[in-house]
Amino acid sequence: MFLGTYTPKLDEKGRLTLPAKFRDALAGGLMVTKGQDHSLAVYPREEFTALARKAAAASRSDPEARAFVRGLAAGTDEQHADAQGRITLSADHRRYAGLSKDCVVIGSVDFLEIWDAQAWQTYVEANEENYSQATGVALGEIV
């Protein structure tokens, strides 16, 4: 499970060091794709494969699903962390997420999100008041 908030730096070559506690879960390969709210999503290869297959199965008859699958496939880069736990983010991914040197990596249970540090702070501040309401939506009657 991916949990927590981390603040790695993006180096001049576009490399980002993944948090050490997640490296074993990502050792089999990982997929970096465009996420929501101009973040990047990082999935373990197996998790991404299941997601992509599910989306592809629905896409044959639904134009919106086909568009999603096309965007997902075109915007995804397969990666393997190097010996120092770094991955290289493509220029397209860095541009999409507006990444500068200061980044934030957050755990989102079954995947990671990579944010520009300022964009993450803005997002947190804008959504702080909605957290209670979102809890009810996400968890329903459990809470």
UniProtKB/Swiss-Prot annotation:
It is found in: Cytoplasm, Nucleoid. Keywords: Cytoplasm, DNA-binding, Repeat, Transcription, Transcription regulation. GO terms for molecular function: DNA-binding transcription factor activity; transcription cis-regulatory region binding. GO terms for cellular component: cytoplasm; nucleoid. Gene3D superfamilies: Transcriptional regulator MraZ domain. It holds the Pfam family MraZ. The keyword Repeat applies. The keyword Transcription applies. One of its GO terms (biological process) is negative regulation of DNA-templated transcription initiation. Residues 5-47, 76-119 form the SpoVT-AbrB domain. Forms oligomers. NCBIfam families: division/cell wall cluster transcriptional repressor MraZ. HAMAP family: MraZ. Belongs to the MraZ family. This is Transcriptional regulator MraZ.
